[in-house]
Amino acid sequence: MDFDYENAKFSMPEKRIFDSQGTLDFQNSVAMVRIQYHLQKYITLCKGQQIPDTIKESFFTNIVVELLKRLSALIDETPPERMHSRYGNLSYRDWQTKFQNQLENWLHELLPEKYNNSIIELSYYISNAFGSKERIDYGTGHELSFLAVIICLDMLKIETIKGPALLYCFNSYYDVIQKLILTYKLEPAGSHGVWGLDDHFHFSYILGATQLLDVNTSLIPKDISNTRLMEQNSSSNLFCKSIRFINVVKSGPFSNHSPLLYNISRSVHTWHKMQQGLIKMYKVEVLNKFPVVQHFWFGTAFFPWTSYGNNHSLPIYQPAENNDDADFLTANNATTKMPPPLSTSTSRFIHRR
């Protein structure tokens, strides 16, 4: 997919999704087409690949991995407060402040100088990829922002991205996120509780299932409840890494705390069907859910708020200011309510004929 950096006009990303109508318009945007295109591209690149132990130095990996190393070091420099609450250690906000204060300088240092114009947009997606400073939480919307970061770097054509490098970068990202969650007790953002796929992640499962396609592996979907196997394969596969993390943060039988994953693993018998179901679910439960995408903002270059059909600006259903009734929005029948919880049934995961 072509991206003309030389003629692109970058701007500070702004909120454009205020309600369910905005979510609907998002599905027909240039931004969504770019996300879907790169989603499929990265799935293809990671097919049958393992996470490498080391990676050859390159511009792309140096930018991503060095940034993640610095963020991990910031965690070490910002120990959590002693608190009795189960979630939300306030030291996370201190970490976020340090992160935000240094990010622009880091990007000027890490990015080739010719791409400096892109920093105004790139920095927003990086800032939003590591949880919410206000809510002290992390979820699939933040994970989506990191996917956007990778897409931005890809569109800049810094270099050709290959599957092992992509997996190495995502694995490094999930290492930092898991460290953040465990250190600062980040709450799940918009969690469906036991009715959701996972409190924090979704894209990691897609990449992990993709890694297991067209390879000689003894792993099968129902093995996800085997703690030992997930631990053994967590360093080479993102699906196993995600399951391992669930076992770290949750206790009790897997079927009790993660019934949707458990039921899927019992009804889906191949990694191909697992991958296809996860992609379908991602498009519905992440890319097309207002509580998730409302925090995905739009600039004028990487992810513009324009129609893919005619390249015209999409409408903005922004709440009216100074309205006596804050529940009414400028768009009719708009809603900002959290959708009902997912059923633990797998009927929304796979089509039965």
From Swiss-Prot:
It holds the Pfam family PTPA. One of its GO terms (cellular component) is nucleus. Gene3D superfamilies: 1.20.120.1150. Its EC number is 5.2.1.8. It is found in: Cytoplasm; Nucleus. GO terms for biological process: mitotic spindle organization. It comes from the Eukaryota. Residues 331-353 are annotated as: Disordered. It catalyses: [protein]-peptidylproline (omega=180) = [protein]-peptidylproline (omega=0). Residues 343-353 have a biased composition (Polar residues). One of its GO terms (molecular function) is peptidyl-prolyl cis-trans isomerase activity. InterPro entries: Phstyr_phstse_ac, PTPA_C_lid, PTPA_sf. Keywords: Cytoplasm, Isomerase, Nucleus, Rotamase. Its main location: cytoplasm. Belongs to the PTPA-type PPIase family. PPIases accelerate the folding of proteins. It catalyzes the cis-trans isomerization of proline imidic peptide bonds in oligopeptides. Acts as a regulatory subunit for PP2A-like phosphatases modulating their activity or substrate specificity, probably by inducing a conformational change in the catalytic subunit, a direct target of the PPIase. Can reactivate inactive phosphatase PP2A-phosphatase methylesterase complexes (PP2Ai) in presence of ATP and Mg(2+) by dissociating the inactive form from the complex. This is Serine/threonine-protein phosphatase 2A activator 1. The lineage of its organism: Eukaryota, Fungi, Dikarya, Ascomycota, Saccharomycotina.
